[in-house]
Amino acid sequence: MNKRTTRLLMDGLISTALVVLWRAIGFEWQSTESLGVTLAIGLVPLIWLGLRHGSATAIVFAAIAGAINLILSRPEWDWITKILTEVTPLLAAGIAGVFAKYTQKTLNNRRLSSTYLNIVTASLLVSLVYFALRYVVIPIVLPAVDGLALNQLPLWGGWLATTVIASVVLILMARINQSLIIPKRSKYLSRKETSSLLND
């Protein structure tokens, strides 16, 4: 197993563990009750994974995290409901991978305003699709699943708050150390472009 694969697996396992942790403590529903908005913090590590390793990696580990979360879902739900509720919305993380190449290239070239724009756009779109699937579309298809009203704060406030949190966390990571976003031997950069990372 080469170093790139090892790093990818480690990043994927870290992201999966964080997603499952947030799900296990029931943070989304706790935030709805205590803050009045639904915060999908578990999306942050998956967006990071997509920006770092691409869509396919983000989708695979999102599916793994969702599969583990099936254990934590309501016991009265059938398997179709569990899969649609716990797995399908997390697959939105794959959208972040669309922005991986240009996030890494602009960060490597220190064009930070473009990097930040890519991060914010990825966070916004992933969060939007996740909230639309998990709290609007799936509850319409499966009435047994709790949803959120389109005209209420928990849905829209949660989407915006999740976008802001994800964007701030990922932008801070990019500012603190670009290797937190760009892996060594990144498939999105040439060997010449990654030489500085390899020498760190």
Task: Name each model feature, range by range.
Residues 1-52, 56-57:
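Hydrophobic transmembrane alpha-helices
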Residues 9-18, 74-99:
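Alpha-helical transmembrane segments and their immediate interhelical/interface regions
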Residues 15-26, 64-75, 123-133:
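Aromatic-anchored segments of alpha-helical transmembrane domains
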Residues 20, 47-48, 67-71, 94, ...:
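Alpha-helical transmembrane segments of multipass membrane proteins
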Residues 31-36, 78-86, 99-200:
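Membrane-embedded alpha-helical hairpins and interfacial helices in multi-pass inner-membrane proteins
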Residues 39-46, 85-93, 165-166:
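Hydrophobic core segments of transmembrane alpha-helices in multi-pass, intramembrane catalytic enzymes
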Residues 55-60, 111-115:
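Membrane-helix interface segments
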Residues 57-64, 84:
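Hydrophobic alpha-helical membrane segments of integral membrane proteins
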